[in-house]
């Protein structure tokens, strides 16, 4: 059986991603359409939108494409080095834009706000990292500091390092965030032990530990919301 593959240029103008973006704005486009604009062209038998859909499914969405190595993407049929470079550059722009909101004194009002600030960058890391978000009295971000790299372990984490920048900045509070490279954000017993130690140290330093978030693949857990290590109000 012969399959007839429609090229993007043969689609009606209302179905072409660039024309739809011009008419309706980028927010109106599906993920595959946005990615197709970056890719520009597909490969024999597959147009750019179809290639974009395949990539998003194959790699598990934007976070999977972020995690994928350059060579892994470049060797994929229909990609190559030029398309891979364009895609990686666009993903990095998105990451930096999100982090820039912290530099503009982004205000954190909920665990979701904190997770959105950190998730794009931290969900693709191969190693566990512990970071502290330093906040002022209005919960505005002062600085995000990486304080530890490696499996969270009560005997290895230096609690003083968690608060070092917060003390220097005279922060009112911190939110602690770490990732699980496995993708499962369920806090471990060790996570709970370390969190209790940080909460106690924060009390002594008069710096409130507002929450400890565990980041997974597209998901997160707020230990305060779960009542883990934190006393429920």
From Swiss-Prot:
Pfam families to which the protein is assigned, alphabetical: RadC (PF04002), UPF0758_N (PF20582)
CDD domains cross-referenced by the UniProt entry: MPN_DUF2466
UniProt GO molecular function: metal ion binding; metallopeptidase activity
Annotated GO biological process: proteolysis
Lineage top rank: taxon: Bacteria
Motif (JAMM motif): 178-191
Record key words, sorted: Hydrolase, Metal-binding, Metalloprotease, Protease, Zinc
Keyword Metal-binding among record annotations: yes
InterPro entries given in the database record: MPN, RadC_JAB, RuvA_2-like, UPF0758, UPF0758_CS, UPF0758_N
Ranges where the MPN domain occurs: 107-229
Residues bound to Zn(2+): 178, 180, 191
SUPFAM superfamilies: RuvA domain 2-like
Family stated for the protein in its record: Belongs to the UPF0758 family.
NCBIfam families: PRK00024.1, radc
Name this protein carries in UniProt: UPF0758 protein Rcas_0037
Species for this entry: Roseiflexus castenholzii (strain DSM 13941 / HLO8)
């Amino acid at each position: 059986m012969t399959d007839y593959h429609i090229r993007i240029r043969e689609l009606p103008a209302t179905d072409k991603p660039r024309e739809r973006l011009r008419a309706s704005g980028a927010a109106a486009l599906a993920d595959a359409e946005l990615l197709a604009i970056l890719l520009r062209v597909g490969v024999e038998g597959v147009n750019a939108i179809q290639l974009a859909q395949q990539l998003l499914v194959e790699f598990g969405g934007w976070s999977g494409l972020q995690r994928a190595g350059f060579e892994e993407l470049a060797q994929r049929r229909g990609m190559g080095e030029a398309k891979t470079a364009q895609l990686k550059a666009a993903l990095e722009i998105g990451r930096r834009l999100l982090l820039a909101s912290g530099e503009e004194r982004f205000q954190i009002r909920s665990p979701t706000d904190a997770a959105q600030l950190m998730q794009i960058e931290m969900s693709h890391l191969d190693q566990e990292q512990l970071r502290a978000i330093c906040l002022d009295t209005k919960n505005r971000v002062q600085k995000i500091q990486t304080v530890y790299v490696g499996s969270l372990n009560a005997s290895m984490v230096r609690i003083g390092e968690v608060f070092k920048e917060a003390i220097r900045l005279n922060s009112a509070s911190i939110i602690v965030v770490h990732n699980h490279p496995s993708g499962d954000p369920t806090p471990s017993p060790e996570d709970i032990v370390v969190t209790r130690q940080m909460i106690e140290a924060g009390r002594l330093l008069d710096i409130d530990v507002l929450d400890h978030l565990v980041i997974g693949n597209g998901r997160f857990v707020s230990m305060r919301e779960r009542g883990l290590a934190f006393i429920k109000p």
